[in-house]
A protein has these predicted regions:
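A conserved amphipathic helix/loop scaffold
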Residues: 28, 36-170
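Aromatic-Pro/Gly-enriched surface loop or interdomain linker
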Residues: 1-31, 150
């Protein structure tokens, strides 16, 4: 569902994309990478994504990235495993949203559904927060400058009317 969400948004905006194998480690040919819900990944792959951004790449990552290794063993460190500095965030809580909207810093909003992480910004700039009485201090969408590149993090599954402008503006 997450891959389809992103692919449909790119398609509607007439943005071509390649599907890249999880065995790939050299992403230098790409202007930007979109990594949807990469729940299980080796440390080697996560390190390659970190290097890609550090060397000037632009990464769009979604919730649940780097949660487990390739054998599905859950990482017990701060999430997202090995990508916290690159993304400029961390989280240790997630929940199922019920009637929760996110609000961007420029006044747009969208309804969340199915998944939301309670993201804390370390070096990232929050682009959207949850419009919720108890979860409003957590970021839903962030952007981080990291060495020579940048990373956009989508910490929730939300409606398309916000996804497309975020992808295009990034």
């Amino acid at each position: 569902a997450v891959m389809r969400w992103l692919a449909d948004a790119l398609y509607r905006r007439n943005i071509e994309f390649d599907m890249v194998s999880s065995g790939e480690r050299d992403f230098s040919a790409y202007d930007f990478l979109v990594v949807p819900a990469l729940y299980a990944a080796s440390d080697d792959l996560l390190g390659a994504l970190d290097r890609y951004v550090a060397e000037g790449g632009h990464l769009i990552a979604t919730f649940r990235i780097g949660f487990a290794d390739e054998q599905l063993k859950i990482h017990h460190d701060v999430q997202p495993h090995l990508l916290g500095r690159c993304l400029g965030i961390h989280y240790d809580q997630f929940t199922y949203p019920k009637n929760v909207r996110i609000a961007t810093t420029d006044g747009r909003s969208a309804l969340t559904h199915d998944w939301m992480e309670l993201v804390t910004c370390d070096t990232a700039t929050p682009l959207a927060h949850y419009d919720h009485p108890f979860r409003g201090s957590y970021a839903a969408v962030t952007e981080n400058a990291y060495q020579k590149g940048s990373a956009l993090y989508l910490g929730a599954f939300f409606d398309d009317e916000l996804l497309e402008p975020l992808l295009v503006s990034y």
